[in-house]
Amino acid sequence: MTKIGVFLLFLQSMKNKDKKLKSFEKSLEVMDMLREECPWNRAQTNESLRPMTLEEVYELSDAVLKKEEDNLKKELGDVFLHIMFYSRIAEEEGRFDIADVMDKLCEKMIYRHPHVFSDTKAADAEEVSTNWEMLKAKEKGGNRRILSGIPDSMPTVLKAYSMQDKARGVGFDWEKKQDVWDKVKEELGEYEAELEALDKASSEDEAAAARSRAEEELGDFMFATINAARLYGLDPDTALNRACDKFRRRFTYLEEKTIRQGRDLHDMTLEQMDEIWDEAKARGL
């Protein structure tokens, strides 16, 4: 490429960066006006925003899974709004502002990517991930526990996967992924045994104890199954979401066909419902 070509690319890059900075500045100005002039926005706190933030993150997740580009852009904006919201509240309280948030982010990204910003070498993504966890622990003076960064309120499937993945980072993992199936079968057997004990319980106290044990064994079985998915490179959360979507499609088909036929699901036998369900399945729903 000629020198003038390189110069033109540089000018275009600066123009794009200027556009992004102006949009960011405009977003901050809108946030400032909302906090100053809108009663609802003025009334919000970190605590009141939290459930709405979770909802926005799930809506973003849906947009990603469904590959809805226009909706993805919208949901990213909604999540970004919440980041500005929390930062503005902190600024009003004299704790920090959005600049501090961005500076902290940049500081962390630079520190945890020495293979990009210094002379450290990383052969592949696996090595990058291992280095990331080591640097994260070093930030806390080496006293940070491996699983301490996993939020208690994290959805349980993701929490289990994250725990297993972090344990893998220090070598606590199956040497051969095929060996995990013995654990899955073992946990399934223990779960079935407790269910049988629950069925045979002769008193409320006995049933309560058996139910508690069965619940614990169910958790162990699910944890082992999630571990198996991880070892084979599968995302258990995505897999379960796909199963839920499939069930929704087929059940909706069953419900809508029943309505068109002038019938009510409550009055149908399981065999009648299964017939329509199999029809939905045959249609690829």
Regions found by a protein language model. Give the residues of each.
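Flexible "arm" and connector segments at domain edges
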Residues: 5, 10-75, 81-218, 223-285
